[in-house]
Design a protein with these regions (language model features):
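Acidic/histidine-rich helix-loop elements
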Residues: 15-25, 76, 143-151
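Cys-nucleophile CN-hydrolase/nitrilase-fold catalytic domain and related Cys-dependent amidase chemistry
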Residues: 24, 28, 32-132, 138-142, ...
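CN hydrolase (nitrilase-like) catalytic-core segments centered on the catalytic cysteine
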Residues: 79-99, 177, 183-278, 348, ...
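C-terminal beta-strand edge segments of enzyme domains
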Residues: 237-380
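Active-site-proximal beta-strand elements of phosphoester/diester hydrolases
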Residues: 2-19, 23, 51, 117, ...
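Eukaryotic scaffold repeat domains enriched in small/polar residues
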Residues: 20-23, 43, 97, 167-170, ...
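Active-site catalytic loop in hydrolytic enzyme cores
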Residues: 108-201, 210-224
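Short beta-strand scaffold segments in enzyme catalytic cores
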Residues: 100-102, 116-120, 169-170, 256-258, ...
């Protein structure tokens, strides 16, 4: 029998968590949403895969500096924990794989740091995949792997294959090989390629906020990931998020999509609010195309030596983004993130990558931020 089934992206409304109770409000609502999606969308083919967007469980719960430590201690859940166990019971009830995300602590990796984590739970209720978000937009004050790079080197050594598996894990399941990207990660083609090179056939790439949904940047990125890597892209977004300040204070998002391995949109919901997208995922068709196609199964033709020199050259120049920024201190505050952006722009101009307009002067950087960056550079 051909391996094909229905997949669902749930576009739910959620809460920007100020306590663990807000996570549970979203979890309990999702129980109903998942039940409906399986009940209705199985009229096409049985639903075997359900996904929930970044922010769909507890929002983003942001805070740098001392606020980061308070949120760690008082708000965010732990993965694995009661929340993933609750979702595991739902997966067992409906015999589905579930992809979701939470801002959470992962004490086995590093205490006192908050991570943005995508995860997959199988039909037996088991947590089979976790992925730590590797890059952020400037309003997110969580911890990425490169922020604690020495922890990764201690855990995995400098073996590139082990680090590749740790940074871009892929769950090899009976319904296909699934990798996960979270929001800003999908802004970088390398992240999706990292999953593809570990065998991904389905890439979950969760939401972008506005204005980058309405101007189609998110869609263009996701279609590109699908084409470049011959993968399905499952891209749910939140339907809206209740901000701290009252149940009537809500921002909408929307535009959830599913894209096939040829880059075609096969399901979408353009508006905000609670909804879902669903499409038939034909894994055997994808596998057949990868094996019999001559050209657009592009990964087979990667001349890796030619691309490797790009990053070798950047490393020889000291790298781009400073690593190990959160080994000794929590992530920057939003205010200090702006200072970090200034530093990065100055660096790109200095390296000759960006060309500045006439009469441009390098940005002045807040001294405390400059010192923290300088400390990481001194350790190179």
């Amino acid at each position: 029998m051909t391996l094909q089934y229905s997949a669902v992206g749930i576009q739910n409304e959620s809460h920007m968590a100020t306590s663990i109770d807000d996570y549970w409000k979203d979890l309990e609502r999702l129980q109903t949403s998942i039940a409906y999606s399986v009940w209705n969308c199985s009229l096409d083919l049985p639903v075997q895969l359900v996904s929930v967007s970044e922010g769909g469980i507890g929002g983003w719960c942001l805070g740098g500096g001392e606020e980061h430590l308070r949120i760690y201690n008082e708000v965010v859940p732990e993965i694995p924990g009661k929340e993933t166990e609750f979702l595991g019971e739902i997966c067992k009830q409906f015999n589905i794989f579930l992809i979701a995300q939470m801002v959470a602590k992962v004490p086995d990796l590093m205490p006192d740091r908050i991570f943005n984590v995508a995860f997959i739970i199988d039909p037996n209720g088991e947590l089979i995949h976790t992925h730590i978000k590797t890059s952020f937009y400037q309003k997110e004050t969580n911890t990425a792997p490169s922020d604690i790079w020495d922890v990764y080197l201690e855990k995995y050594g400098d073996d590139p294959e082990k680090l590749h598996d740790a940074l871009y894990p892929v769950a090899k399941t009976e319904i296909g090989n699934i990798g996960t990207l979270i929001c800003a990660e999908g802004s970088y083609p390398e992240a999706a390629r990292g999953l593809a090179m570990n065998g991904a056939e389905i890439i979950y790439r969760s939401q972008y906020p506005e204005p980058w949904m309405g101007n189609n940047m998110n869609q263009i990125q996701n279609q590109s990931h699908a084409i470049f890597n011959t993968c399905y892209v499952l891209a749910p977004n939140i339907g809206g998020i209740y901000m701290p300040g009252g149940e009537d204070f809500k921002f909408s998002n929307g535009k959830s999509q599913i894209i096939d391995y040829r880059g075609q949109i096969i399901s979408e919901y353009l508006s905000g609010g609670e909804a879902l997208v669903s499409a038939i995922i034909n894994i055997d068709g994808l596998r057949d195309f990868r094996l019999r196609g001559q050209w657009q199964n592009l990964a087979k033709d990667m001349r890796v030596e030619e691309y490797k020199v790009i990053y070798d050259a950047m490393m020889a120049k000291g790298g781009i983004y400073p690593k190990n920024l959160c080994m000794d201190e929590p992530p920057f505050t939003e205010e200090d993130q702006v200072e970090l952006v200034k530093h990065q722009v100055n660096k790109m101009v200095k390296l000759g990558i960006y060309t500045a307009p006439k009469n441009w002067e390098p940005y002045k950087i807040k001294e405390s931020v400059a010192e923290r960056i300088k400390k990481t550079e001194a350790e190179l």
